[in-house]
Curated annotation (Swiss-Prot):
Organism from which the protein derives: Halorhodospira halophila (strain DSM 244 / SL1) (Ectothiorhodospira halophila (strain DSM 244 / SL1))
Protein name, UniProt field: Phosphatidylglycerol--prolipoprotein diacylglyceryl transferase
Class in the EC hierarchy, top level: transferase
Classification lineage: Bacteria, Pseudomonadati, Pseudomonadota, Gammaproteobacteria, Chromatiales
Biological function: Catalyzes the transfer of the diacylglyceryl group from phosphatidylglycerol to the sulfhydryl group of the N-terminal cysteine of a prolipoprotein, the first step in the formation of mature lipoproteins.
InterPro entries with a match to the protein in the record: Lgt (IPR001640)
Family: Belongs to the Lgt family.
GO MF annotations in UniProt: phosphatidylglycerol-prolipoprotein diacylglyceryl transferase activity
NCBIfam families (alphabetical): lgt
Annotated transmembrane regions: 17-37, 56-76, 94-114, 118-138, 173-193, 199-219, 236-256
Topological type in the membrane: Multi-pass membrane protein
Length: 261
């Protein structure tokens, strides 16, 4: 059994300005996406130039932040938004939804693709492998914040979160970091190393993330004000993830059939 380390969520205090670890994790994710994007842009099959990657990351970052924050409140905490609309601006408090961020990024990529006249699926295939490092960093931020804790567990690496009592729990944030961040990055980077049918990389991202997320939900506590939706185990995260898996598999099948046609 492990004890959760009491980590100060503020990484650096500069007078009245507090720099939070959670915010720094987003910076790490965006910088990683920018660096990897610049590297991928040197490939002969890249739909964007290295200079265009700068704008792509800016559009993507804007879509992630706006979509993730709005998505959290719309999917998980609509009453909280009505009671405190300014909570939308307090990014350091967490409360970011992946599914909302995905919608925001999709909209941002759509605008970018229209602006530069790039087929949307070519652009999303380029961008998908840039995302997992940011996802993993975000889950590390959740761990530092002491949020999104796991269900009670008796495994040797179970962790006690003092604010929740003495009951050991799964460190589900670290599970998500390992699967949605590290494993997904390795999978997508390997898969996209060779030219693939248009839409295949995007489809793999959607399907693989969906499977990883649905799996980890079995070890993660649902939001207290929502609870389980059915069967004593089904969570809202799993419900929102199912369309991703179906869309991802469908997109891969479509891409390969189109390639072989």
């Amino acid at each position: 059994m492990l004890v959760y380390p009491d980590i100060d969520p503020v990484a650096l205090q500069l007078g009245p300005v507090a720099i939070h670890w959670y915010g720094l994790m987003y910076v790490v994710g965006f910088l990683a996406a920018w660096g990897l994007g610049r590297w991928r842009a040197r490939r002969s099959d890249s739909p964007v130039t290295g200079q265009q990657v700068d704008d792509l990351v800016f559009f993507g970052a804007l879509g992630v932040i706006v979509g993730a924050k709005l998505g959290y409140h719309l999917f998980y905490n609509l009453d909280g938004l009505a009671a405190d609309p300014l909570s939308l601006l307090r990014l350091w408090e967490g409360g970011m939804s992946f599914h909302g961020g995905l919608l925001g990024v999709t909209a941002a990529l759509g605008v970018y693709a229209w602006r530069y006249r790039i087929p949307l699926l070519r652009l999303s295939d380029f961008a998908a492998p840039l995302v997992p490092i940011g996802l993993g960093a975000g889950r590390l931020g959740n761990f530092i914040n002491g949020e999104l804790w796991g269900r009670p567990a008796d495994v040797p690496w179970a962790m006690v979160y003092p604010p929740l009592g003495d009951e050991p729990r799964h460190p589900s944030q670290l599970y998500q970091m390992g699967l949605e961040g590290i494993a997904l990055f390795i999978l997508l980077w390997w898969f996209s190393a060779k030219p693939r049918a248009r839409g295949a990389v995007t489809g793999l991202f959607l399907a693989a993330y969906g499977v990883f997320r649905a799996f980890v939900e079995f070890f993660r506590m649902p939001d207290a004000h929502i609870g389980y939706l059915a069967f004593g185990w089904l969570t809202l995260g799993q419900v929102l993830t199912l369309p991703m898996i179906l869309a991802g598999v469908g997109l891969m099948v479509w891409a390969w059939r189109r390639r072989d046609a």
